[in-house]
């Protein structure tokens, strides 16, 4: 994959700092009416996206949960979603510029706290997802903040940061999930699927459907520039799409019918894989 995704704790801190600053910069340059623009994340506006980032980082910083009632919302369908929505609901009546200023105050505190983790990178941290080591926790935060940064960018029509560490890490997470997603896509045993991202983040990976314990299993074939000898034979379908299209689909933000991609091989196979490719809750 090029550029390579961050993996070391120091690299992940830098990736977090980069996407967190991008969210701040976007917020600071929003006109008042732009805060109310809808985003590709169901039910959330531009301001809501920033509120969500603040809410999660605030919770990790020890802030108490907001005392608000979320109520019935069609995009909230589980307890975790309810937890996320409380932070957004608590700020719905707050003017957009004030929400941005809250992030401007919290963000440097979080960066400083993450730098402190370098002293003990093996420690276990309590997070909403359970106990995680610092690198695992930072990786989760990078892809979450970067994903919501992209939600904001699309709403504002300011596409960018698609060659960033956050973009590379999100791309990696989607491709890492491919074996399980292909296995669940209902494809015939023996089917091979290749996904190529054409840029700005460039990557290529392949999965073959095999039988394991009587069930379909996605066997990863390679990661790199070419299939091993003999593994390109048979029912092979290649899906090519940009970093933007892959990550928007992986985030569940764009329906397959609205996705731009190219297929070599079976179109129906490609559609089944893309339908199953969402990795977000």
What are these language model-derived features?
Residues 36-77, 128-184, 246:
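Short, contiguous alpha-helical
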Residues 87-161:
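Contiguous mid-protein beta-loop-alpha structural module that forms a pocket-lining wall or clamp
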Residues 197-238:
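Acidic/His-leaning functional-site neighborhoods
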Residues 167-211:
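A glycine-rich beta-turn/hairpin centered on an aromatic-Pro dipeptide
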Residues 227-281:
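C-terminal interaction segments
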Residues 24-45, 113-132:
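Helix-loop segments that flank and shape redox-cofactor active sites
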Residues 1-39:
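Non-cleavable N-terminal signal-anchor transmembrane helices
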Residues 1-11, 60-116:
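Short, helix-capping/interhelical loops that line the mouth of catalytic, cofactor-
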